[in-house]
Amino acid sequence: MSTTPATPKVGFVSLGCPKALVDSERILTQLRMEGYEVVPTYEDADVVVVNTCGFIDSAKAESLEVIGEAIKENGKVIVTGCMGVEEGSIRDVHPSVLSVTGPQQYEQVVNAVHEVVPPRQDHNPLIDLVPPQGVKLTPRHYAYLKISEGCNHSCSFCIIPSMRGKLVSRPVGEVLSEAERLVKAGVKEILVISQDTSAYGVDVKYKTDFWNGRPVKTRMLELCEALSSLGAWVRLHYVYPYPNVDDVIPLMAAGKILPYLDIPFQHASPKVLKSMKRPAFEDRTLARIKNWREQCPELVIRSTFIVGFPGETEEDFQYLLDWLTEAQLDRVGCFQYSPVEGAPANDLGLEEVPDDVKQERWDRFMAHQQAISSARLQLRIGKEIEVLIDEVEEQGSVGRSFFDAPEIDGSVFIDGDHGLKPGDKVRCRVVDADEYDMWAEPV
C-alpha cells in the first residue's frame, strides 16, 4: 500500500537589516514554490536556514549564537548571509554546519536544502500556489522593495562592499513590475531600500528600460515618478547625500511620494568625516537641508550617526551637537563606534576613544537630539495627518504617519474602537506628542 511522501519542512531565521530580510523572502519564495513547508519551530523542521548579519561584531556574535541554538535544537543547519563570507569564522565555532554561503547566493542555499531534504517529486505547484508577490515576512500592508545590491563607496568603518560587492542596479522594469504586484496584493506602503538608493543606475549609466510598454530610465528620479503612479505610499531609505537628491524633493512637495528622507550622515565634524571617508561638506549639507525644507515644508529627515569614532575629540563631538541644533533633524539614531574586523578604520592609526567616553557622548547626543525631536513633533499638535494602521489592540489602534518608517521610528496611537484594521488609512488630528510618538483621533 503506497503512502503519500511527507512534506519537507524548513525552519528559517532571518537576522539583520531589511536588505537581508528581502534576501530571506526570495529564498523562502523559491522553497515554497517547490512545495516546502516553512515551520516556526526548530523541532518541527527537517533543516534550518540561518540568514546571518556580519555588519558589526555584536551582529556577528548574535549570528553565531543563533547558529549554535539551531544546531542544539535541530542539528541540521545551513548558513547564509553577510557573515557567510567569513566561512572560517563560522566553522571555527560551529564545525557541524552543513553549508555556508554569502549574501545573494539564493540558488546555492536552495540547492543545500535539496541535499538535506529533497523536494517531493509529486509536488503540484498548482495546488500549493505561491502568491504573485512571493513570500513576504512583513505585514501584508507594507513591503520592502530592494532596487540594487552592493555599494561603490569605501567608508572606512564599513565592510559592506567586501560582503555584497560593488553596486549592481536591478533593471527598473523588473523593480516596477515587482512593485505593481505588491500593490495589487494589498500593499499600501513601499519602502525603497538598497545600500545606496541615490546611486541607483550609476553602474548601468542610467540606461533606459521598459515597464508596461513605456520607457523608464534606471535612475532614482524616474523610479520615484513611476512608483508614485501606483497609489501606495513610497518611502525612500538609505539615501546618500548626492546632489541628485534635490531632484526628488519636488515629487515630495507635490505629494507624489512621502516627504521622508533617510540619509545616514554619520557625523558632522569635517575631520571625522574625512577619517570615515564620507563627504565632508557639512556646511553645504545644512544649506541643502534648508533648501529642501523651503521647497517641501513637510519634509521629515531621518539619519544615523556614529560617536566615538577613532580620533574623535571633545571638540569634534561638540561640533556634531552644534550641527544637530542647526540641522533640526526629525528622526535620529546613534551608535557607539565598534571596530569591525576587516574595516579600513582599524588601520588608520588614530587614537581609540575609551568606552566610558563613548557612552558619555552617546548619552549626551541622545538627550540633545531628543529635545529637538520632541520640539519638532510638538509642532504637529492640532494638525491633520493620514495614519496607516499597523495593529489593533484592545485599547485602540497603533499606526504610523509619513513621519514614521516601520521598526525604526515612532508610532501614532489612536484610542478607542473605531472599527479599524491593519492596512486601513485614516485621517486624524494630532492631540499630543512626545519625542518619538504622537497621539491622534480620527476626524
UniProtKB/Swiss-Prot annotation:
One of its GO terms (biological process) is tRNA modification. Residues 8-118 form the MTTase N-terminal domain. It holds the Pfam family UPF0004. Disulfide bonds: none annotated. It comes from the Bacteria. Keywords: 4Fe-4S, Cytoplasm, Iron, Iron-sulfur, Metal-binding, S-adenosyl-L-methionine, Transferase. Its cofactor is [4Fe-4S] cluster. Belongs to the methylthiotransferase family. RimO subfamily. Binds 2 [4Fe-4S] clusters. One cluster is coordinated with 3 cysteines and an exchangeable S-adenosyl-L-methionine. Transmembrane segments: none annotated. This is Ribosomal protein uS12 methylthiotransferase RimO. Catalyzes the methylthiolation of an aspartic acid residue of ribosomal protein uS12. Residues 137-376 form the Radical SAM core domain. [4Fe-4S] cluster 2 binds at C151, C155, C158. The gene is rimO. Its EC number is 2.8.4.4. It catalyses: L-aspartate(89)-[ribosomal protein uS12]-hydrogen + (sulfur carrier)-SH + AH2 + 2 S-adenosyl-L-methionine = 3-methylsulfanyl-L-aspartate(89)-[ribosomal protein uS12]-hydrogen + (sulfur carrier)-H + 5'-deoxyadenosine + L-methionine + A + S-adenosyl-L-homocysteine + 2 H(+). It comes from Pseudomonas putida (strain W619). It is found in: Cytoplasm. GO terms for molecular function: 4 iron, 4 sulfur cluster binding; aspartic acid methylthiotransferase activity; metal ion binding; protein methylthiotransferase activity. GO terms for cellular component: cytosol.
